[in-house]
């Protein structure tokens, strides 16, 4: 079969929050089984069964448990706190790990996956949280069914990321997640999906399943998986979650993905009618392994490691090893060892997630070229006959011998209902770099988060990661952070030239010491308009842009294009003047001061600089040029072609009659973007597309101050100077306008060119300007590398049985405001606010005073915070739209009904749609509350984003069953 690449890995296993820490756990022979007492188990029932690994009569149980599974960051996923506490922690954990797997792959869900045929295949079995919530009917609400449904585990992920490929949960017990991997591969191979997320999740939240397994004699008395050992007496339960990102290998190679492993083949089968429903079946195990080998095109003798099911039962272990022997010994020489082991000896049996745990273990082993130790093996099970065979069990971390061909391994998972799965893995191909282009002297690292605390936490993670991975290349770190991470509102940009400097800069940020090259800000959701200002004469010097010329092909190509066009007009090559050999610098400097060369050189340099900024996605909303700079501005605005512009420039310093003749030969067009004329100081009109305008331009005065005033009046706040010196910045300061907005240079004489360029780019980024980061590095050979994943800001969301009173199912009708304070859920503060609104409503000037709008905003914050389930004094963001807050149609209907009841208004449903926020809704309500005699005054000011029409609730709220 066609090979499938594993390009991203995310995991949470006991003692390991990510793949790196999981490998450390495995490599260091760590057994994470521990006692836990913080789960709502039925301890009395557990103690009745002696085989359950409890400690005396204490309320604790042994297992491979995750920390703080009741904690979650709903804000990150735009889920309301109210709904979050009804969502199975397995769903919540899966969302986080899936996001981490995509970050590990360097994939941006919003731009690369949204609306695509991306499949989600997940394994899950346990329904413990549903059992907890079902214990008291009083706690049931509209979110229970969706929140605890196993199928929704996959569907919610697809919904939140807008993934439109297959989305399903597979339950084959212990083999669930490996079966999910198999079907994800099939979806890719058939073309049904172009990318898949596959894996599984398992949490132990109640005692019922443990009691049942104890009755079935499946649990080890000492709480240890002693796989292959003579003392094996069952397994210990464990928790975990793992997700891998899968892609066809050819596509991954084409896209430059970080390939971490390869799936060569996979197979799934069933025991059928055998010794018993839950009994292992040797012939079926052999069959599924042979099928996987056949699909992979691999001989049994090529497999050098197998991650086994290894559930530590005397019969099951011997059947599995004997099945492996029967298959893997075929064609194998005595000196061709095949190692076997089980991750269950480290973390317990994570049941539905056990297959993905084994697969991730093998992927990490292939990456490191080492095989972890198999724990708790003191005396081999006498029924396992591997003495004097190539089958071996590692008891220490050991090298995985390299071979001429890539290393190959197998992973098995056998469900206790008889569904078996086997996957063949191959190590990733080596990455080869052929970097011919001279590297930049500086680099730009971008980091962002949804909140300031998360940004601080992420910076801390980066520091630790950089120190733990000294071999990572700085360019690859910065590349991955830019193209492989979503860019949120709270941003940091750092300009550096070494990893040591990067670590120091991040430490400076943590302490609040914003040093040179360190920029942070909360990005605007609506970035300011950008004006490009093209510098005039007086800023020229030899070697301006030399670093850019040697390191940036787009800049170099633009300079060389101008040089070729100018050859018929200039005696000397422009390149010889701009970038002379050291021995020719004095002559070149003298020539550059001659008008015949000054103007063409400045034009070519600024045109190339513009092309470079444009290739990074930084494009102006308006352009303005000072003197000769206006020719560049007009060119990029489309007034004339590059060839015509250079023809004009080459003749501009000559006799006026000659220039006039040339000007009348040029083809002119109206500007395609806003162009400020420095002849008039206003927006250019149709005159700019005439020869006479450019003839007058030669001797006309430059209206710089007026031009800048025009830009300010048009709302421009970001100014990027396209020139070799920030001359216009100095002139603007003289106009006393420089403190209004952001002024950014492209270059500064005497400073490293990349340091200046990247500083300006970093400031644009933190301000919220969209950057084409792929374009930024398109000319370099970069590699995506593993970087820290998002630090979720978790809080506790858990339903404690017996603590919640029955919820009211309907809202009260219109009552007096004082009654509402006691008979509805409105707080005393809201009652006061409603009194103020009612008083203000009777005033003729209600719609004219901003404090009334403030009252409405406060009222809505209180109501929405209550409906969303916010804790304490937390209030929703007034500029965040309702769906970003996590509100759904049920919540919006509740809000609408409450507003109508409180304010005696008829509120149309669609007022809540199309990006509505608290501010826009308050404005609409404000308009409805205005007395008749002032309605006309305010009507013209109303936000026409919403068309007020009536929509029935039944037309809006639809639940598909």
Give residue spans per PLM region.
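Flexible, low-complexity segments
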Residues: 497, 523, 562, 601-623, ...
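Condensing-enzyme catalytic core of the thiolase-fold
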Residues: 1-437, 590, 611, 640-654, ...
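Short helix-loop capping/hinge segments that flank enzyme active sites or metal/cofactor-binding pockets
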Residues: 63-69, 669-692, 764
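Flexible, low-complexity inter-domain linkers and amphipathic docking helices that mediate domain-domain
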Residues: 1-9, 41, 48, 54, ...
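Flexible catalytic loop/linker elements that gate and position reactive groups at enzyme active sites
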Residues: 10-12, 280-295, 408-530, 546, ...
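FabD-like malonyl-/acyl-CoA
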Residues: 449, 517-657, 718-731, 746-750, ...
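Catalytic nucleophile loop
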Residues: 177-180, 630, 889
